Amino acid sequence: MTKSELIARLAERYPQLVAKDADYAVKTILDAMSDALATGQRIEIRGFGSFALNSRPPRIGRNPKSGDKVMVPEKRVPHFKPGKQLRERVDAMVGQPIIED
């Protein structure tokens, strides 16, 4: 599901919401989540999951084109951990085909 599909589904599910308002709501939520992660905060949405930052240590990598060794610096990456309700809901789908767009 893309961001525009999420906005369309939100507007469809709540007819009192104008599509423009649904767009604003989704963008506001995503901006708030991005800002929180950018400042090192953890985000927890009960029943859905949590977002946090993981730190990846510096390492020596290889340039795939030349094969030369390259120093890859330390970096922080967002990490999502699904909540119990989400895990159970997804697990209940075992045996059903996965829909790929």
Curated annotation (Swiss-Prot):
Organism superkingdom: Bacteria
Entry keyword annotation includes DNA-binding: yes
Any GO molecular function: DNA binding
NCBIfam families: hip (TIGR00988), PRK00199.1 (NF001222)
Key words of the record: DNA recombination, DNA-binding, Transcription, Transcription regulation, Translation regulation
PANTHER family found in the cross-reference section: DNA-BINDING PROTEIN HU (PTHR33175), INTEGRATION HOST FACTOR SUBUNIT BETA (PTHR33175:SF5)
Cellular component GO terms held in the UniProt record: chromosome; cytosol
Role summary: This protein is one of the two subunits of integration host factor, a specific DNA-binding protein that functions in genetic recombination as well as in transcriptional and translational control.
Recorded family membership: Belongs to the bacterial histone-like protein family.
Pfam families xrefs: Bac_DNA_binding
BP terms from Gene Ontology: DNA recombination; regulation of DNA-templated transcription; regulation of translation
Signal peptide region: none
Cross-referenced InterPro entries: Hist_DNA-bd, IHF-like_DNA-bd_dom_sf, IHF_beta
Keyword DNA-binding: yes
Name by which UniProt lists this protein: Integration host factor subunit beta
Subunit-structure text: Heterodimer of an alpha and a beta chain.
